[in-house]
Amino acid sequence: MTIWFDMDGTISDLYAVENWLPMLRAENPKPYAQARPLGNMQMLARKLNKLHRAGYTIGVISWGSKESSKAYLEAVREAKEKWLDKHLHSVKWDAIHVVEYGTPKENFKLGAEDILFDDEERNRESWGEYSFDPSQIMEILSALG
């Protein structure tokens, strides 16, 4: 079973970065690097590492900016990977997918019981069962082990 995380609005507070939208429209990746974590990253890392040791696969499925060149998508991918390394350094990610905006996240499902944490309701609806709002992250992870 894989536990998947969206980033923006789920574990990363992109939308609180001042002028985030104009910067994204100007293809500036800084807001992705500047975003503060949402929640206690040390506690999240401990839970994820425990679950990883128990055999769970851990991954990220995150969209790039809505209007994006290929070069900007690559810059966003790099910024998001650096953010993960900075804030969840001890977590061994099995997969990190930073994909074009709007790519169906369910395309990355590896099994029927895969879990998705995502702030976008439409992503949770299209994922189906085992998709959760970010407010449920610690509750669900604790229930898994």
Positions of PLM-derived features:
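The start of beta-strands in P-loop NTPase/AAA+ ATPase cores
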Residues: M1-I3, E113-D114
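Alpha-helical substrate-recognition element adjacent to the catalytic core
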Residues: T2-H87
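A structural signal for isolated positions on well-ordered beta-strands in alpha/beta enzyme cores
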Residues: T57-G59, H97, I115
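Conserved beta-strand termini and adjacent loop/short-helix elements that scaffold enzyme active sites
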Residues: I61, V98-Y101, P134-S135
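Lumenal/extracellular "mature" regions of secretory-pathway glycan-modifying transferases
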Residues: A75-E78, V91-V98, D133
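Metal-dependent phosphoesterase core characteristic of DEDDh/y 3'-5' exonuclease domains
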Residues: D85-V91, P104-N107, E120
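Acidic, Mg2+-coordinating phosphoryl-transfer loop and its flanking beta/alpha structural elements
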Residues: G111-G145
